[in-house]
């Protein structure tokens, strides 16, 4: 076998990248001819495909799933779905995950050489307290959830209480969330790139904690089977039965009618008491009632807050 045949066979067995390098090396040894020497282009590495955007439920599940670590995944998934359906922090989760999605590549590249990578769960460890979202250890008891053993021996997730819960947050954008996470201990090597990204107006995801008008807020509560309007009134008050009727009316009804209790069929006592509660959180009597639903003050916990 000639040397040329041997070279050709060896060349044919080389990977594509090494073939290009071998051809360029051979061409470099050739004497210059009348025309330009043709170079074989190096293979161009493809840019990594953009990663899927993380939505609020993905973040919620990542953060709270360890609450049920004793169960197999088959049992955990229904629990997480139930909790998400009743979670009061959907806007906050969507916001935290939107910010993470926009800077995800920078965060993953930043600490590539460190033992502690900035994963979604690690990011949420810092973002959750900044946003005022309930921590993992307090979530179930604060919102009235418990794991209950059923008569057949299975364990089910049940809501055994309906605590009143208030949240009071300040307006925040993505850059503000990131800097507050850094103040809380988040370490990012290439923070200048993240700051530049979040400072770009096209990526400035604003999350407003806008207070709704009192009529709008209580209209939503009236449309919720979990927050009946009767919760606004003093216990055992004479107009409580009328309040139960209010809770059965749909939201469009209130948007058309305007103020609560102004339509015919409700007693003057009902109108006076409800109007007073919605305006300033004060009933006309000295009886106690759930002020957390009627006042714009930060409250958290059971029965109007602690």
Swiss-Prot record:
Signal peptide: none
GO CC, alphabetical: nucleus
Cell location: Nucleus
TM spans (from-to): none
Residue ranges of DNA binding: 49-104
GO biological process, one term: positive regulation of mating-type specific transcription, DNA-templated
Domain of life where this protein originates: Eukaryota
Keyword terms: DNA-binding, Nucleus, Transcription, Transcription regulation
InterPro entries named among the record's database cross-references: MATalpha_HMGbox
GO MF term list: DNA binding, bending
Function: Mating type proteins are sequence specific DNA-binding proteins that act as master switches in fungal differentiation by controlling gene expression in a cell type-specific fashion. Transcriptional activator that induces the transcription of alpha-specific genes.
Annotated family: Belongs to the MATALPHA1 family.
Protein's recorded name: Mating type protein SmtA-1
Source organism of this protein record: Sordaria macrospora (strain ATCC MYA-333 / DSM 997 / K(L3346) / K-hell)
